[in-house]
Design a protein with these regions (language model features):
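The conserved acidic donor/metal-binding loop of glycosyltransferases
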Residues: 87-91
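N-proximal low-complexity "stem/linker" segments adjacent to membrane-targeting elements
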Residues: 1-20
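Short beta-strand/loop segment that forms part of the nucleotide-sugar
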Residues: 6, 28-37
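Short, acidic, metal-binding catalytic loop of nucleotide-sugar glycosyltransferases
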Residues: 20-29
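Catalytic-site signature of metal-activated, phosphate-bearing donor transferases
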Residues: 64-69, 94-232
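Active-site-proximal specificity loops/subdomain of glycosyltransferases
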Residues: 46-85
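A conserved acidic beta->alpha catalytic loop
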Residues: 34-45, 58-60
Length: 232
């Protein structure tokens, strides 16, 4: 019923959790990993879970313009009508039965974004139950390509201007964003990302927060904890 497309670079920490999340809701879903030349266990984990891995090359750099184009086109040859286009840390809380019900009347699933945060200093992703609403992550990640001819994501895919028969669901489904899973992990991810930013990203300012001082990132993490409420 559904094909899931996700973009990955060195996602060995999140990938198994993401796969388990979607396979528990859509047991027969196909998951396609568009891998940006990962150097960790990302590809190994993907293949061991019967995911298809398709590499894409950006010359060792993060280029949000190329990533936008990939998200706008990677799903068009899918054999299923319903496609889900997301990053590895974006988990949509909808199951097969719910989607079948929505498919009778709607072509895009409406979402409410939540920034999830680990209240403990560990890597136990399954124990992360707290978060806060973030409309920036209320993304249009799940849609029916039989009716949506172009999704037209902007960079980051936070917004889009779809064309075709555009019918958003009345029901709203939570989209959990697992960015704040561990302070040290986040800081190291930011440092790695800052080193890989393309000239196009630097000129546009996209991803500039990855260069923030470590102290600022730790404060943001603690601030998120202070306002988090139980979500799951």
């Amino acid at each position: 019923m559904i094909t899931i497309f996700t973009m990955a670079y060195n996602e060995e920490v999140m990938l198994q959790f993401m796969i388990d999340h979607y396979r528990s809701r859509f047991p027969n879903c196909q998951i396609i990993i568009r891998d940006n030349q990962s150097t960790d266990r990302t590809v190994e984990i993907a293949l061991s879970n019967n995911c298809e891995v398709l590499p894409y090359d950006t010359g060792g750099q993060i280029d949000d313009f190329k990533l936008r184009d990939l998200k706008n086109n990677c799903w068009k040859e899918s054999k299923t009508d319903w496609v889900l286009v997301c990053d590895v840390d974006e988990l949509l809380d909808i199951n097969e039965e719910q989607l079948k019900n929505e498919a009778a009347n709607f072509t895009i699933i409406k979402t409410q974004g939540y920034d999830m945060i680990n209240m403990e200093d560990n890597f136990d992703l399954s124990s992360i139950k707290y978060g806060s609403k973030d409309n920036n992550y209320s993304k249009s990640v799940l849609f029916n390509k039989q009716y949506i001819k172009e999704i037209n994501y902007y960079c980051g895919a936070h917004n889009c201007t779809p064309s075709g028969t555009v019918l958003y669901s009345d029901n709203i489904y939570n989209l959990y964003h697992y960015k704040f899973i561990n302070q040290d992990y986040l800081i190291n991810r930011f440092k790695l990302t800052a080193q890989r930013l393309s000239e196009a990203n630097k000129k546009s300012g996209m991803g500039a927060y990855n260069s923030d001082p470590e102290e600022k990132t730790r404060k943001v993490f603690q601030d998120r904890r202070s306002v988090a409420t139980k979500v799951l």
